[in-house]
Each structure stands twice: as structure tokens, then as C-alpha cells.
From Swiss-Prot:
Pfam families, per database record: TGT (PF01702)
InterPro entries: TGT, TGT-like_sf, tRNA_ribo_trans-like
Lineage: Bacteria, Pseudomonadati, Chlamydiota, Chlamydiia, Chlamydiales
Task of the protein: Catalyzes the base-exchange of a guanine (G) residue with the queuine precursor 7-aminomethyl-7-deazaguanine (PreQ1) at position 34 (anticodon wobble position) in tRNAs with GU(N) anticodons (tRNA-Asp, -Asn, -His and -Tyr). Catalysis occurs through a double-displacement mechanism. The nucleophile active site attacks the C1' of nucleotide 34 to detach the guanine base from the RNA, forming a covalent enzyme-RNA intermediate. The proton acceptor active site deprotonates the incoming PreQ1, allowing a nucleophilic attack on the C1' of the ribose to form the product.
Residue span of region RNA binding: 262-268, 286-290
Pathway recorded for this protein: tRNA modification; tRNA-queuosine biosynthesis
Record key words, sorted: Glycosyltransferase, Metal-binding, Queuosine biosynthesis, Transferase, tRNA processing, Zinc
Record EC number: 2.4.2.29
Protein name in UniProt: Queuine tRNA-ribosyltransferase
Active site: 89, 281
Length: 372
């Protein structure tokens, strides 16, 4: 079945809202944080049963083991042993971000042009790119992207779009926006020929240009997409991103769920949720964990610091994650990182992912009380 979005409460203080997205594999309480399982797995975490929605990357699964192989094994849910909702992207994000730099990198002011090492050629038909695994030259069109996502079998899928960096010149920027909406329309048409249990979000582009964002919203809302995703360049810092998201959501109707693509660090979530964003995806908590940055209510903990060498307390006394309930001390976790024990990233990732889910629960409770 296509997803159903239920609005439970609209805050009286802002555009923040609490809702539920109903899919054939379960219900997602919103606002929700969506961890990224790049290759169909969360790095350092085996059990993802308590995570309501998981984001898998079509690009990486396209290169290995291949969507057809996954389809023969029953689709991603059976392949991964997951009986809860999954969202996949189009593959375009990785193609273009490997060439240009990602949206998150731009927000951190390091979105410098990388060159075209992976991206070979863009035409109106699609994108040619080189596999980072073996150098093969591959082609991805809107139809091929959707078919790959059909084979993977995710609950929510994304149409092919072109991700542009902040530094693009105006002429190419406008050309790209137009081409992206043609690609999205082709993607939607292909999807609707065989919708199965899947739903498709339309992606809104437009960079920092309010008029182009308005055009993007109008395009997505005029087409029968099941949800809206805010994509494209979001600026170079949190302030610019806030302006982009505020402008974009001001044009959106309230009937569909709204996802913010590629953004999911805590400062951004706190800043964006008031604009009515329903879900955020990011590899932030697991990536931070692998680098020894531990999330806690009192603020991030850089576990490698000397001051934790004799700290026998758990990461967060109020936390109910497996790491904290197992009595893993800060001193022990620091030791594991210092000796490069693989368990360090595992314990840290389990905690960080649980922390993100708890933060989202607290955000939903605050919205219900009209505190956000």
C-alpha cells in the first residue's frame, strides 16, 4: 500500500507537528531521525529493530550485490532481516556528491569542488559515472533508478535528481533544475506503472533562490507524489539552511510528510523541526561514534580526552541503551578507542543511535505540549 500520513498535533508555537507515517512494514512516529545504512547495514550495529525508519543507498547497493540479486533474495527487508520501514535514495546523491561534495559538507563550509573523478557525463537521458569499486562506466536514468529501487523493495523511494553544489553558476543552475524536474516526472511515471507497496517522495530543488524553491514546491505538489523531500544545495552554514528550509516549507501544503535530505545532526534538527520537517536522514551518529564523539544529554563527549581515563561512570546515567545498561564506563570506552579495539565503535554507535531516538521522542513530546 502507499503510505498514509496522519497529522496528530500541530504546534501552536511554530510549524512543528507530530504525526505518523503508515507503511506496509510499520508505522513511523514523526518527527523522526532516520539513520543511514549505506550498504544495507548500520556500521557497528547488528540490531536495528528499534529504529522506525532506515535509509539505504541505492548507489552502493547498485554496485554490490546489485538490485537484481537483492530482488532474488526477497528484497531488502528479507535480505537484511528487517521487518520495519526502509527508504532508499535514487543513487543520484552519491554520483553527484562524490564529484562535487555533499550537502552536509557544504553546511560545514567545506564543499569545495572535488572535480569530476566519478561523474563522467550528464545528459538529458541520465548520468554516466564510474564505479568506485572497479572503474566500470555505468549509466543511471530515471527509469533505471526507479527499477533498481523496485528490485530493492523499499517502502519509500526517491526519484532521480541532480545534486548541485553551492558554487554552480546561474545558467547551469537553472538548466539543472529544469532537467531534474523532467527526471522526477519520468521517475514518477515509471513508478506509477507498477507501484506495488511503495511510495515516492518528490524532491524540491532551487538552491538559495526563493523563486526557484517556490517553483520546485509547485512542481512537486502538482504531481501525485506521496511526500515531499527538500533537497539540493542548502547553503554554506546553518543560518543559510534555516532560511532555505523556512522559505521552502512556507510554500508547502500540510497534507504530505516532509523529509529533509542528508541533514540529521542535532543542531540542525533542533533548528529545522520548527519549520514542520517530519524526518531527517544522516550518518552523523554512527560516523561520530566511530571517531570517538559520544552524544549525551549534557553535550557531546570526546571520549579520547585524558580526563575520562579514570572516569568509572557510564556515558549517561539516564540512558537505557545496551551500552549504558551493560555498565560500559567512560574509562573503559576510552581504553577501547585508544587500543583501536573494534568493540569501541560498536558500543559507541549503539549508544549514539539510541540517544538520537530518545531526542526525537523528547521533541515529539515537546511539540505535543506546544513547547516547540
Amino acid at each position: 500500500m502507499a503510505l498514509k500520513f496522519h497529522l496528530i498535533h500541530q504546534s501552536k508555537k511554530s510549524q512543528a507537528r507530530v504525526g505518523q507515517i503508515e507503511t506496509s512494514h510499520g508505522v513511523i512516529d514523526t518527527p523522526a531521525f532516520v539513520p543511514v545504512a549505506t550498504h544495507g547495514a548500520l556500521k557497528g550495529v547488528i540490531d536495528h529493530s528499534d529504529i522506525p525508519l532506515l535509509f539505504c543507498n541505492t548507489y552502493h547497493l547498485l554496485l554490490h550485490p546489485g538490485p537484481e540479486a537483492v530482488a532474488k533474495l526477497g528484497g531488502l527487508h528479507q535480505f537484511m532481516g528487517r521487518q520495519a520501514p526502509i527508504i532508499t535514495d535514487s543513487g543520484g546523491f552519491q554520483i553527484f556528491s562524490l564529484a562535487y561534495g555533499s550537502v552536509a559538507e557544504e553546511i560545514k563550509s567545506c564543499g569545495k569542488k572535488k572535480g569530476m573523478s566519478s561523474l563522467v557525463k550528464i545528459t538529458d537521458e541520465g548520468a554516466w559515472f564510474k564505479s568506485y569499486r572497479d572503474g566500470r562506466k555505468l549509466f543511471l536514468s530515471p527509469e533505471l533508478s526507479v527499477q533498481a529501487q523496485k528490485d530493492l523493495g523499499a517502502d519509500i523511494i526517491i526519484p532521480l535528481d541532480e545534486l548541485l553544489p553551492f558554487h554552480t553558476d546561474q545558467e547551469y543552475f537553472l538548466t539543472s533544475c529544469s532537467r531534474t524536474y523532467v527526471w522526477e516526472k519520468r521517475s514518477l511515471e515509471y513508478h506509477r506503472k507498477d507501484p506495488r507497496h511503495q511510495s515516492m517522495y518528490g524532491v524540491i530543488h532551487g538552491g538559495l533562490d526563493p523563486e526557484q524553491r517556490r517553483i520546485g514546491v509547485r512542481f512537486v505538489e502538482d504531481e501525485p507524489f506521496d511526500g515531499s523531500a527538500i533537497g539540493g544545495s542548502l547553503g554554506r552554514n546553518l543560518q543559510e539552511m534555516s532560511e532555505v528550509v523556512k522559505i521552502t516549507t512556507s510554500f508547502l501544503s500540510k497534507e504530505r510528510p516532509v523529509h529533509l535530505l542528508g541533514i540529521g545532526d542535532l543542531p540542525s534538527i533542533y533548528a529545522m523541526v520548527g519549520f514542520g520537517i517530519d524526518s531527517f536522514d544522516s550518518s552523523y551518529p554512527t560516523k561520530a561514534a566511530r571517531h570517538g564523539l559520544i552524544l549525551s544529554k549534557a553535550g557531546p563527549i570526546k571520549i579520547g580526552q585524558q580526563k575520562y581515563s579514570q572516569d568509572s561512570s557510564t556515558i549517561d546515567p539516564s540512558c537505557s541503551c545496551l551500552t549504558c545498561l551493560s555498565g560500559i564506563s567512560r574509562a573503559y570506552l576510552r581504553h577501547l578507542f585508544k587500543v583501536r579495539e573494534p568493540n569501541a565503535a560498536i558500543w559507541a554507535s549503539i549508544h549514539n543511535l539510541h540517544h538520537m531516538q530518545q531526542v526525537m521522542k523528547e521533541i515529539r513530546e515537546a511539540i505535543l505540549k506546544d513547547e516547540i
